């Protein structure tokens, strides 16, 4: 897909401040809802240390993606000059200007070997599967807790009845599973079939609701701490909670797959590395405030933090409205995002099939087509009809698998913290750390050997030494081992 932004004009562009705000909104997603529980489980000092280091590693990887993006633009610039026999303009710093959006998948196709390319696609696919499982768990669990009796009074079990007056068969888990089926089959399946994606109005609505929800949660927890004192006293560190904390930390700083879509339209990229570092710092402070207030304000933090604000019946009307708004917040935001992730996942399967079993004349698609899905009005059926390609059993099995597997995982467990930690720890590590390292290593080599010009200092990541790539790789490997040991029950 081609970008709507013309490289020579300003159509579709925005100021650097707006672009940085988009980056902030992209990072601060619903993954933050699992952080307070992870903070309380792992301890406040370990949580602050790990989240700080994870944020720094995530920032380093983000600069790698931006540097690879500049090299990709130089490759396209050289290709255009060759096509038009423009031998006057030589390779130079200006060719590395980020003027055209090149998705992560396109950069992978430019720079990586077939093995690394397939690895990148599979990493994204597994990560998106985890994303869908988190979505199809968070929404039904929020709905179940709205319908069932409040969870703040006592610690409840999934086997407890939804209401004391209801039949025993209608346990909280039964009601939760009912909402899983309703959410996937009744709500999401029609949107996926119809190819419905997020519109600008829905994007504005979800952004406003996200800001309102996070500000309300921080304010309410702070008020509770100031009036009632700390309800819980988390330890400074608890290494047994390392696994869930690390996975949530990776998941909370995930933005790398969408960096090209946000950086390219900026009218100026002056000092972009430094300003993105400021964004990461602000996000870190925001996460610390949200997580620490929640970890100390509530005796038992829920894995979906918004559920802690479902008060007893004796609260005022204003508090009740706020509480139910917070409980509905994940339902509103995730329902609008589910079809985008599902359609992106379906497209990724098709791309992997084309890589492994190539067809003559088959058009390559982007690895992450969330933005392109909005711009492309043709459905898959219309494209296939135009190209004369009838539906195959693969075209039927893939959408079925995309919806069925995450739904099955959600039916097995309602532990969103577990799903977020696994998704962030394994495929998330590949998406956030491994793929950027592979891209920047190959892009730097391509710039020296093929373009015969080093990446200009303006477009260079501040982390040029191979030490940083080795550090990220070592950190990712160590963390994955720690997570695996925690999952199998090894005590520290």
Swiss-Prot record:
- Report the locations given in the UniProt record: Membrane
Q: What are the annotated glycosylation sites?
A: 152, 314
Q: Which residues lie on this side of the membrane: Cytoplasmic?
A: 1-18, 67-114, 199-210, 260-275, 347-391, 437-466
Q: Where is the composition biased (Acidic residues)?
A: 367-382
Q: Where is the signal peptide?
A: none
Region named Disordered: 367-387
Q: Which Pfam families match?
A: Aa_trans
**Entry keyword set:** Glycoprotein, Membrane, Transmembrane, Transmembrane helix
Q: Name one GO cellular component term.
A: membrane
The record places the following residue ranges in the Extracellular compartment, namely 40-45, 136-177, 232-238, 297-325, 413-415, 488-492
User: Where is the chain membrane-spanning?
Assistant: 19-39, 46-66, 115-135, 178-198, 211-231, 239-259, 276-296, 326-346, 392-412, 416-436, 467-487
Q: Which InterPro entries match?
A: AA_transpt_TM
- Keyword Metal-binding belongs to the record: no
Q: Which domain of life is it from?
A: Eukaryota
Classify the protein's membrane topology as the record does: Multi-pass membrane protein
Please give the family membership noted in the entry.
Belongs to the TMEM104 family.
What this protein is called in its record is Transmembrane protein 104 homolog
Q: Which organism is it from?
A: Caenorhabditis briggsae
